[in-house]
Amino acid sequence: YLIFLSVVAALGGFLFGYDTAVISGTIAQVTQLFQLDTLQQGWYVGCALIGSIVGVLFAGILSDKLGRKMTMIISATLFSTSALGCAISADFTQLVVYRIIGGVGIGVVSIVSPLYISEVAVAQYRGRLVSLYQLAVTVGFLGAYLINYQLLAYAESGNQLSMDWLNKIFVTEVWRGMLGMETLPAVLFFIIIFF
């Protein structure tokens, strides 16, 4: 059960890694679609860090007042909102706002998940279990790169999907699918926190 709790909390690290790395596959299409200049490109890539700062500043306060699990639930909600919002953004401003929301999730989870693991772990295994969080961050990076690669390969294959909205997300504007795919692990994180 201790390992399960640690893996659940470490899933927050996966989301941190995914959210941080997924942006790399989206820059070219987002730049073209919204006709971004280099300053706007930088803002698009870096705006999540603003949210991260906010998340880090409030993570300790939230976790002390609401508890570690409730704060991780808030983080999962922020990640889900960000991923879904990015996938359906109508303009650049909306996209940036949702990226900042995801950044808040990054900031919160980067404090609370390792803290939670260290509190539930017995001293004998604490170091190993807390390291699961960092491993999950790295796996999140890899996951984002693999998802980006697969979605881009599918989009470039010329295959079309039968529903227009799916076609838009996974073929014509595949960056939406890349950002939106984070919804799946975020919802999983949200659900399994309750166990």
Show the residue positions of the predicted features.
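Transmembrane-helix signature of 12-pass secondary carriers
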Residues: 1-195
